[in-house]
Curated annotation (Swiss-Prot):
Enzyme Commission (EC) number: 3.2.1.23
The protein's assembly and partners: Homodimer. May form higher multimers.
Name of the protein: Beta-galactosidase
Record-annotated disulphide pairs: 195-230, 626-634
Cellular component terms per the entry's GO annotation: lysosome
InterPro entries attached to this UniProt entry: B-gal_1-like, BetaGal1-like_ABD1, BetaGal_gal-bd, Galactose-bd-like_sf, Gly_Hdrlase_35_cat, Glyco_hydro_35_CS, Glycoside_Hdrlase_35, Glycoside_hydrolase_SF
Carbohydrate-modified residues: 26, 247, 464, 498, 545, 555
UniProt similarity note: Belongs to the glycosyl hydrolase 35 family.
Length: 682
């Protein structure tokens, strides 16, 4: 062996043993930092500003992560921003999900492979129009817990969760060879009433403990002094958020009051806006968004476009606002990429703005995915919920003198059936009431199998019913999504207070927590063989124009002889009212064409099969189109175009803060971190 190799080998051996990635990192240290004196970021010593877009991996199937990320890169973005919803990964205490659609590490590595940097927003609270703002519902088992505070019960749960999540993130930090350049602590905390600096300091210490002292930690709050009073903390870099039409100079001056030096940052520049059931679909004009983006970039600021792709609130993951208004299944957000990942006019307009400031990648942009209209599919009614309780609640019911909440029976999402008997004769219409607005969120009411109507949070708290003494009173209660923003995120579900019948409190409840997911995946297929056809009990209906909540099932096959199938599609519900839909056991989410604005649900191709028929399961809660007195068929239809609502341009984003606070619609005017209610009721 040559002499110089003998001398140098002991020096090289430690690097060789570290492997290629770690060895390179030690040989050439990667650094991402704030250069306060230069009012900018430095990446490996060079000036840097990010142009980022928000994508929530929890709202996009893993099957499509690469497609969406590539489209974001080709738009000229150099960074993506994503939330980590705690409840998406720990839906039950101590039971963690980090595989398949929950594999956040894979998602971040994929972004890295595509040359995208990452802004990580791990909460623990995220808002995001997501169920309970990303906090797990099981936290409410401590009924007096004060969320987002230094409450010991809350801190203990947060500490345990961060101890699971953040060590997974540390190898993915930029300085460790990964894509994560900055990490947000909490989320718009200045908009929350608690104003608990001990809580923020606790988070700051735990983030540094798990991620190291050289990680860039930041906060985000609305561009108003009020929010920064409780949202900013020394040692966490303060950023602001605001939408198109805002006064950019004023907004960044607010940031400068907390951060006299350092980069200007808009962490949430709104490309669109959120929706609620029963309100028009929100859009913001492309030219308004493009013009404001140009002005932000012209100031040398870093910016994140919220959202660049919205995606879908599959299953039960949508959130809600106060006064109670649930968000729909679609989180399209009028973003540059549609819910289905399609290129829009806004995409190309914003790309044109970005390329005036930064070089955009050359080459073809991945096209919009093809869609296919599979047509109508007939569905057969199987059983009502009441007739299927042995399958839906295999462990049996819970007895209680007074009604229990979802949390008390450990049912965090979905449905619970509450049953008691009428203690008096109600041959004449008798008021069934929730005097303290205690139905959270909708209750489908029946007496001896005869539907009576619906009780609904904030909207319908009294319903006249009829029945004889001793008749069975059923209330199927639906959790429509927990409040994700504001003071009322301690959102208990079910019957959260007593019901009265003609002013008398009802007692003696039998409570059935329903495992609809397991039933749909494992058992529904067997129902058809055991008990097919229409059921007289199931089809009972009254003058209230409701039918009993029931399951419907149908099958369809992907056409043969057509290349490149299956393809994405959209399912619509002509004549149906409100419910939940599954395809091949995959919970697509809620449909509610009777209220809108969303009429179709996105169906990604990866859940469809070509080797066997595809099974559609519908749980209709109010009224199906094929009731016993009508000629209509029970059918759904697959179409190749989405219908998520009529276009409605809300002008509340372009008004001064003082005007925005009072301007409907929506009734809750929220500038992400700024909210004013005309009614603070639950």
């Amino acid at each position: 062996m040559p002499g110089f190799l003998v001398r140098i080998l002991p020096l090289l051996l430690p690097l060789l043993l570290l492997g290629p990635t770690r060895g390179l990192r030690n040989a050439t240290r990667r650094v991402f930092e704030i250069a306060y004196s230069q009012d900018r970021f430095l990446k490996d010593g060079q000036p840097f500003r990010y142009i980022s877009g928000s994508i929530h991996y929890s709202r996009v199937p893993r099957f499509y992560w690469k497609d969406r990320l590539l489209k974001m890169k080709m738009a000229g973005l150099n960074t993506i921003q994503t939330y980590v919803p705690w409840n998406f990964h720990e839906p039950w205490p101590g039971q963690y999900q980090f595989s398949e659609d929950h594999d956040v590490e894979y998602f971040l590595r994929l972004a890295h492979e595509l040359g995208l940097l990452v802004i990580l927003r791990p909460g623990p609270y995220i808002c995001a129009e997501w169920e309970m703002g990303g906090l797990p519902a099981w936290l409410l088992e401590k009924e007096a817990i004060l969320l987002r505070s230094s409450d010991p019960d809350y801190l203990a749960a947060v500490d345990k969760w961060l101890g699971v999540l953040l060590p997974k993130m540390k190898p993915l930090l930029y300085q460790n060879g990964g894509p994560i350049i900055t990490v947000q602590v909490e989320n718009e905390y200045g908009s929350y009433f608690a104003c608990d600096f001990d809580y923020l300091r606790f988070l700051q210490k735990r983030f540094h403990h798990h991620l190291g002292d050289d990680v860039v930690l930041f906060t985000t709050d609305g561009a108003h002094e009020t929010f920064l009073q409780c949202g900013a903390l020394q040692g966490l870099y303060t950023t602001v958020d605001f939408g198109p039409g805002s006064n950019i100079t004023d907004a960044f001056q607010i940031q400068r009051k907390c951060e006299p030096k350092g980069p200007l940052i808009n962490s949430e520049f709104y490309t669109g806006w959120l929706d609620h059931w029963g309100q028009p679909h929100s859009t913001i004009k492309t030219e308004v968004v493009a013009s404001s983006l140009y002005d932000i970039l012209a100031r040398g600021a870093s910016v994140n476009l919220y959202m660049f792709i919205g995606g879908t609130n599959f299953a039960y993951w949508n959130g809600a606002n106060s006064p109670y208004a649930a968000q729909p299944t679609s989180y399209d957000y009028d973003a540059p990429l549609s819910e289905a990942g399609d290129l829009t006019e806004k995409y190309f307009a914003l790309r044109n703005v970005i390329q005036k400031f930064e070089k955009v990648p050359e080459g073809p942009i991945p096209p919009s995915t093809p869609k296919f209209a599979y047509g109508k599919v007939s569905l057969e009614k199987l059983k009502t919920v009441g007739a299927a309780l042995d399958i839906l609640c295999p462990s049996g019911p819970i007895k209680s003198l007074y009604p229990l909440t979802f949390i008390q029976v450990k049912q965090y999402y979905g449905f619970v059936l509450y049953r008691t008997t009428l203690p008096q004769d109600c041959s004449n219409s008798t008021p069934l009431s929730s005097p303290f607005n205690g139905v959270h969120d909708r209750a489908y009411v029946a007496v001896d199998g005869i539907p009576q109507g619906v009780l609904e949070r904030n909207r319908v708290i009294t319903l006249n019913i009829t029945g004889k003494t001793g008749a069975t009173l059923d209330l199927l209660v639906e959790n429509m999504g927990r409040v994700n923003y504001g003071a009322y995120i301690n959102d208990f579900k079910g019957l959260v207070s007593n019901l009265t019948l003609d002013s008398n409190i009802l007692t003696g409840w039998t409570i059935f927590p329903l495992d609809t997911e397991d039933a749909v995946r494992s058992h529904l297929g067997g129902w058809e063989h055991r008990d097919s056809g229409r059921h007289d009990e199931a089809w009972a209906h009254s003058s209230s124009n409701y039918t009993l909540p029931a399951f419907y099932v149908g099958n369809f096959s992907i056409p043969s002889g057509i290349p490149d199938l299956p393809q994405d599609t959209f399912i619509q519900f002509p004549g149906w009212t409100k419910g939940q839909v599954w395809i091949n056991g995959f919970n697509l989410g809620r449909y509610w064409p009777a209220r809108g604005p969303q009429l179709t649900l996105f169906v990604p191709q990866h859940i469809l099969m070509t080797s066997a028929p595809n099974t559609i399961t519908v749980l209709e809660l109010e009224r199906a189109p094929c009731s016993s007195d009508g000629p209509e068929l029970c059918a759904v239809e697959f179409v190749d175009r989405p219908v998520i609502g009529s276009s409605q341009i809300y002008d509340h984003l372009s008004k001064p803060v003082e005007q925005r606070l009072m301007a409907p619609p929506p009734k809750k005017t929220k500038i992400r971190g700024w909210s004013m209610y005309d009614d603070e009721s639950l």
